[in-house]
Regions:
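Structural alpha-helical scaffold elements that stabilize or flank donor/cofactor-binding regions
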Residues: 134-135, 195-196, 231
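Conserved beta-alpha-beta core of the PfkB/ribokinase-like small-molecule kinase fold
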Residues: 141, 147-228, 245-246
Length: 338
């Protein structure tokens, strides 16, 4: 059964909106960041990673965001161009704002942390005037990142994009993507997260992220009840993630589908979520069954946590298919199916 319909006449498949950053991942593995001397530089930020992931899978991808007017901004735009992502609506900060920097600390295969520099960042300079109705209308779906709602004028730009998407039969995907930086209070988080969630066709987040979204409305911390609440506003699919325990997609007909992580040689404890999101959305667009969409997303996540980078390691559709095939041959057909 199809739970969501896309307008296939629209030329672009997805337009992610929000944060673009630079990731510095250590090549000195499994030591504190204070002792690391060598790092590799990658394009980062969840919406940017998802954009790259979708493009690698063969989707036609645009982007709405703001980057710094310097060499780091050039690096991002050039990288997007190389990946085939449309950059016509990636703007440049006008007052010296910097691109966000993320340094990762990989202490072990299980323990990782992230050090973010988010003061005076360019991505929060995205202005409502940068959101063009014709561009929004050209996409089958937009992907709004919760981080972009943390500060004005970026949050108003996202809300404008959401309203224009509603007006133009464009599906709205809300990737909650919580980062504690910049938010002033849990009430502020709940106000803006819930506003987008009430208008979304698909909501993707961890249990913690759904709890933050529901902070004011008072939904109990129960996955099924959470899904039913947001589906009462019109959401078709709610995907609630539980890390190592797997994830479940709740559909608006009362059904649910659960997937587990694929076995993987783990290198780091982060990066899987963006691969999961891009592969899940790609599979939905392809018309796959929900359980197959989850399986494709889970496989992509396992590929990502086995790699040093996020954006650079985003797999092609064939790489994900080969990974699933090899995993099932090794561990059995139901390796990731709960």
């Amino acid at each position: 059964m199809k739970y969501i319909e896309f307008d296939m006449s629209k030329p672009l498949d997805f337009i992610p909106i929000g944060r673009i950053a630079i990731d510095f991942n250590p090549t000195d593995m499994y030591m504190p960041i204070s002792e690391s001397s060598n790092f590799n530089k990658y394009v980062g930020g969840s919406p940017a990673n998802i954009a790259v992931g979708l493009a690698r899978l063969g989707c036609k991808v645009g982007f709405i965001g703001c980057v710094s007017a310097d060499q780091f901004g050039d690096f991002v735009v050039n990288y997007f161009d190389k990946e085939g992502i449309d950059t016509s609506h990636v703007t440049r900060a006008k007052n010296g704002e910097c691109i966000g920097l993320t340094f990762t600390e990989i202490l072990s295969k299980e323990k990782s942390s992230i050090l973010m520099y988010r003061d005076n960042v360019a991505d929060f300079c995205l202005d409502p005037s940068d959101v063009d109705e014709d561009y929004i209308a050209s996409a089958k779906a937009i992907v709004i990142s919760g981080t972009a709602l943390a500060k004005s004028p970026s949050r108003e730009a996202c809300l404008k994009a959401m309203m224009l998407a509603k007006k133009n039969n464009v599906r709205i995907i809300f990737d909650i993507d919580y980062r504690e930086y910049t938010w002033k209070s849990k009430d502020e988080i709940a106000v803006y997260y819930s506003l987008v969630a009430q208008n979304a066709d698909i909501i993707i987040g961890s249990r913690e992220e759904f709890d933050l979204t529901e902070g004011i409305v008072g939904v109990k911390a129960d996955d099924k009840e959470s899904a039913q609440y947001w589906q009462s506003f019109g959401a078709s699919i709610c995907v609630i993630k539980h890390g190592k325990e797997g994830s479940t997609a709740y559909t608006n007909d009362g059904k649910y589908y659960t997937i587990k992580p694929f076995p993987a040689v783990k290198l780091k404890g982060f990066g899987g979520g963006d691969g999961y999101g891009s592969s899940f959305l790609y599979s939905l667009l392809q018309g796959k069954d929900i359980i197959d969409c989850l399986e494709f997303g889970s496989a992509s996540a396992s590929i990502l946590i086995s790699a040093h980078s996020c954006s650079d390691a985003m797999p092609t559709a064939k790489q994900v298919e080969d990974f699933i095939k090899e995993s099932k041959e090794k561990y059995g057909e139901m390796v990731a199916r709960a």
